[in-house]
A protein has these predicted regions:
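Expand to "…catalyze enediolate/carbanion chemistry for C-C bond making/breaking, isomerization
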Residues: 1-217
Length: 217
């Protein structure tokens, strides 16, 4: 009921982006975008109705990213919190975001202060191709960022791949080179975004196996 008033107030500020709650239709995003032009909108989908329209919501003008409102979604549907129970919903978020050329979807929050529980929940987000996770407190950010950032093995593989690629002449040799180049670039870009720099590793890392095609790629 306060949507219009909130947007009126926000239009007078230099807000860098908003998370729009209870998105259930394209109109929810487009009408918000009209009132806040050029402001990125994270569409928080929290109901069965919203999930059924998530492809259209992802493609709506103004949608910058999708986010999964797990708590309200479970209340709306009666689902439990087992990862297998929510697998279909999470998959829909990831596929819709990818199809609309959006950044990876943001998973919902984890309630509780246990670092182990939060780490395990973040691993589930990664398994379903999600590249962000809502935090309920500032204290959760470090654990979530650690879980979402590339592993040391992934970074070492990316560095080794490029070193070998250059030693072999730096030319595309077969159809597998392009996806591996893209994957290695993505790993190193993510490492930089999370403050992990190549200088933290040796110039000639030990040989490591290629990481599996998972959340980052």
């Amino acid at each position: 009921p306060w949507w219009a008033d909130d947007l009126e107030m926000l239009s007078k500020t230099s807000v860098g982006g908003i998370m729009l709650a209870m998105v259930e239709s394209v109109d929810h995003v487009t009408e918000t975008a009209k009132r806040l032009p050029n402001v990125p909108i994270v569409a928080l989908v929290e109901t069965a109705r919203g999930l059924e329209r998530i492809t259209e919501i992802a493609s709506a003008k103004g949608t910058f990213r999708l986010a999964f409102g797990i708590g309200d979604f479970r209340r709306d549907t009666g689902f439990g919190d087992n990862p297998a129970t929510l697998a279909y919903a999470r998959s829909r978020f990831t596929i819709a975001a990818k199809a609309a050329h959006l950044p990876g979807a943001i998973d919902g929050p984890t309630i509780g202060s246990s670092s182990r529980k939060l780490s395990e929940a973040t691993a589930v987000s990664i398994e379903f191709g999600m590249t962000g996770k809502i935090c309920l407190t500032p204290e959760q950010c470090a654990t979530v960022n650690e879980g979402l950032s590339p592993s040391l093995d992934e970074i070492a593989w990316a560095q080794e791949f490029f070193a070998e690629f250059e030693r072999d002449g730096g030319e595309i040799r077969n159809g597998s080179d392009l996806p591996r180049i893209a994957r290695a670039n993505k790993i190193l870009d993510l490492a930089k975004a999370y403050g992990i720099h190549p200088s933290m590793f040796g110039d000639d890392p030990d040989h490591v196996s290629a990481p599996s095609d998972t959340y980052h790629y």
